Amino acid sequence: MFHIVDVDNTLVFTDELNTGGYVHALACVDLEPRKVVPRITREIIQDWYPQLSEYDLIHMATLKQVYVESHLDMSQLNAFVARVLSTYGSECCALWTAANPERIHMLLRHHMVTDYRAIRFSNKTENDISHAVQDFCVLFDCEPEELCFYEDNSEVINHLRKLGITVMAVEAKAVA
């Protein structure tokens, strides 16, 4: 079996870090969260403030990134999923994520995660998920049935299962 691990909020719990970054970014532009949510995303900010331009959203993402860089300790390594990487090693493990590559590399360095063969950056649309399965089969010279994905996103989990892929659903850590 070959193990494909999602990074953002599966291997590394990032809800608190991500939300803190967006709260900081909102405050920098004299805005605030409209309600309490487990994880603030760009899409949620767009829903709260539809008048924001694409430039404003990019600016906020930049402010969030600066916050994240100096608050990596707010993230937490998922010991169960990290054990999969250390047990099976780089010959049998790869990572995938829809998150910002720079942020992912910072998180991996911060948590000293090195036991993987490759990282595939994905937008995790249904089409791209199908391509990712093919890419991982090429990487490991295996059949789709030999892949096991670790993922927290229910839509991604459902699509992988529709493709007949084994998936270990990982629940996000409750924010204290």
Language model regions located:
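Active-site neighborhood of HAD-like aspartate-dependent phosphohydrolases
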Residues: 1-38
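Non-catalytic pre-domain segments flanking phosphatase-related domains
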Residues: 1-5, 27, 55, 146, ...
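Conserved SAM-binding loop
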Residues: 11, 93, 149
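Helix-loop "lid/cap" segments that line or gate small-molecule binding pockets
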Residues: 25, 42-55
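Metal-dependent phosphoesterase signature
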Residues: 49-83
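Short, acidic loop-to-helix structural element flanking the phosphoryl-transfer center
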Residues: 69-95, 101-105, 127-131
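Short glycine/proline-centered loop/turn elements that form peptide/ligand docking sites
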Residues: 83, 133, 153-159, 167-176
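Substrate-recognition "cap/lid" segment bordering the active-site pocket of phosphatases
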Residues: 100-148, 154-159
